[in-house]
């Protein structure tokens, strides 16, 4: 049996023998996540006045589902909004996602910064040692999946709701934007490792009946699992693009062209 040889690694934070622009990815991801968290905080806490338009026909993805309006909850503090009640679910699902763990370990904790790139000296002593301590919370990911599916189904209700114009049906640009957001979120959930395990993790074979359906779902999820990072970023970006669109229409900066069927 042949042995192996450990390749030498240049020591010192960020030092490496790599000649590519390895720092681009962690820097871009750190900036993107930083902007996303800052924008969400400002929108939910300070700029929550325009979260829908046309009497709730179209609601911002950040505040969707608008459970306060949906369930006619009016006896609440004036500063409260639906995002404060439901955002912990998508945040909890995304924050414990396997891909997200890779992102924050590389961008914020620098452990490691990138493949074959030296990490900070302090990380050699207190570096990653498994899902222990505060990181044990990552184990709730499989349970957050169920809650995320509920939220996702309610978002499709919002898409249908955008097609209701008084006594008629139709669609608008807002409908298409929320539909695209819901589709991207669906692909992000379906390509998730936890979703894939849900249908194939406890089965050894798929021969017929329910097990054959589970097998097809498992194979579909496995096929898209390789692009899980793509669905992560595109679905996240669409949440904010959708919010900016709704905010712009609600403030009268742009219009929402619609097509109404008789």
Give the role of each language-model region.
Residues 1-262:
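Membrane-embedded alpha-helical bundles that constitute the cytochrome b-like, heme-associated redox core
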């Amino acid at each position: 049996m042949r042995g192996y040889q450990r390749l030498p690694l240049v020591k010192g934070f960020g030092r490496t023998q790599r000649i590519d622009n390895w720092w681009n990815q962690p820097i871009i991801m750190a900036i993107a996540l930083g902007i996303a968290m800052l924008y969400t905080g400002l929108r939910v806490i300070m700029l929550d006045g325009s979260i829908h338009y046309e009497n709730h026909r179209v609601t911002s993805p950040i505040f969707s589902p608008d459970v306060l309006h949906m369930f006619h909850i009016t006896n609440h503090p004036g500063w409260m909004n639906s995002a404060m009640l439901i955002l912990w679910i998508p945040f909890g699902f995304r924050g414990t996602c396997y891909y997200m763990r890779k992102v924050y370990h590389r961008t914020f904790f620098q452990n490691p910064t990138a493949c074959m790139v030296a990490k900070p000296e302090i990380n050699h002593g207190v570096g990653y040692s498994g899902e222990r301590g505060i990181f044990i919370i990552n184990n709730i990911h499989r349970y957050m999946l169920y809650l995320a599916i509920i939220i996702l189904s309610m978002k499709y209700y919002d898409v249908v709701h955008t097609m209701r114009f008084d006594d008629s049906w139709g669609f608008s640009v807002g409908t298409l934007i929320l539909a695209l957001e819901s589709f991207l979120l669906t692909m992000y959930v379906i390509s998730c490792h936890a979703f894939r395990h849900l249908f194939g993790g406890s089965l050894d074979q798929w021969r017929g009946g329910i097990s054959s359906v589970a097998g097809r779902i498992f194979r579909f999820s496995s096929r898209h699992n390789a692009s899980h990072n793509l669905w992560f970023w595109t679905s996240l970006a669409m949440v904010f693009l959708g919010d900016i669109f709704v905010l712009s229409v609600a403030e009268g900066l742009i219009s929402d062209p619609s097509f109404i069927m008789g």
